[in-house]
From Swiss-Prot:
Keywords: Cytoplasm, Metal-binding, Nucleus, Stress response, Transferase, Ubl conjugation pathway, Zinc, Zinc-finger. A zinc finger (SIAH-type) spans 106-166. The keyword Transferase applies. One of its GO terms (cellular component) is cytoplasm. It is found in: Nucleus; Cytoplasm. It catalyses: S-ubiquitinyl-[E2 ubiquitin-conjugating enzyme]-L-cysteine + [acceptor protein]-L-lysine = [E2 ubiquitin-conjugating enzyme]-L-cysteine + N(6)-ubiquitinyl-[acceptor protein]-L-lysine. InterPro entries: 7-in-absentia-prot_TRAF-dom, E3_ubiquitin-ligase_SINA, Sina-like_RING, TRAF-like, Znf_RING, Znf_RING/FYVE/PHD, Znf_SIAH. Its main location: nucleus. Homodimer. Interacts with NEK6. Interacts with SKIPA. This is E3 ubiquitin-protein ligase DIS1. Changing residue 71 to Y: Loss of E3 ligase activity. Induction: Induced by drought stress. GO terms for biological process: negative regulation of response to water deprivation; protein ubiquitination; ubiquitin-dependent protein catabolic process.
Length: 301
């Protein structure tokens, strides 16, 4: 299992390499394509501090504002300080620090997800866009029963789901899950993460939700892939539900956990069962939900 790495995106970014040298800033960079890594060549801490907003402590991007005394501020924080310099309290006006903007344009920085495996070096003004799409960026916790803010790589999240959310773990590519609810009419909007499956060396999450589709109460079951969307397309799955001699079958491609469970649900990308049909499948007097969901995961050739 790969080593666990955890990133807390709520704090400010820190780049702390083993050896620090000043980067050559004589070349303006406008190409978003990553450059080959340059060992031990990074922006000095003093330059990074110059580009740090004194209010939000984030990296500054054009327009970078300055007061008459030369103190700088990012454009996002300017309205928050009511046009007063947070350092000297002088009026800010509309002075831009063009020199600092040009210095920033000439810098190259490593992706903040380098500890996850990204080796690219990016121009300063392209770095944020890359990081928002970086294939090595951490995944958000896929647990759908509550709003969980944990993020990390896949091995970390698997352990987190097992230990912290007590999600059932299952080895194998076929499954047979029975869902029972004594009073299904009480459940209008609810979500459950039933099981995490391990097969083909990958992990898949089975979700089951109750929600309103227009005026009709329905259930939806779907599978999400614990990995990137490109990898998810290598797999397919089927879900089957039925009873009293009838059955419904769904076949599809698992969605990546990059897509939230709400996004998958709202796109109706799964097996949808109307509550009346689910109660019919349950048999009896249709007062208790007893729904058996079976399924299979396979790898496309």
């Amino acid at each position: 299992m790969a080593s666990v790495t955890y990133i807390d995106d709520s704090g400010s970014e820190v780049i702390d390499p083993p050896k620090t040298e000043v980067l050559d800033v004589t070349e303006l960079a406008g190409d978003p394509v990553p450059h080959s890594p340059k060992p031990n060549v990074v922006v000095s801490s003093s330059v990074r501090e110059l580009l740090e907003c004194p209010v939000c402590l984030s990296a500054m991007y054009p327009p970078i504002h300055q007061c008459s005394n030369g103190h700088t501020l990012c454009s996002g924080c300017k309205p928050r300080v009511h046009n007063r310099c947070p350092t000297c309290r002088h009026e800010l006006g509309n002075i831009r620090c063009l020199a600092l903007e040009k210095v920033a344009a000439s810098l190259e920085l490593p992706c903040k997800y380098q500890n996850f495996g990204c080796v690219g070096i990016y121009p300063y003004y392209c770095k944020l866009k890359h990081e928002s799409q970086c294939q090595y960026r951490p995944y958000s916790c896929p647990y759908a029963g509550s709003e969980c803010t944990v993020a990390g790589d896949i091995p970390y999240l698997v352990n987190h789901l097992k230990d912290d959310h007590k999600v059932d773990m299952h080895n194998g590519c076929t499954f047979n899950h029975r869902y029972v609810k004594s009073n299904p009419h009480e459940v209008e909007n609810a979500t459950w993460m039933l099981t995490v499956f391990s097969c083909f060396g990958q992990y898949f999450c089975l979700h089951f939700e109750a929600f309103q589709l227009g005026m009709a109460p329905v259930y939806i079951a779907f599978l999400r892939f614990m990995g990137d969307d490109l990898e998810a397309k290598n797999y397919s799955y089927s879900l089957e539900v039925g009873g009293t001699g009838r059955k419904m079958i769904w076949q599809g491609v698992p969605r990546s956990i990059r897509d939230s469970h709400r996004k998958v649900r709202d796109s109706y990308d799964g097996l949808i069962i109307q509550r009346n049909m689910a109660l019919f499948f349950s048999g009896g007097e249709r007062k208790e939900l007893k729904l058996r969901v079976t399924g299979r995961i396979w790898k496309e050739q």
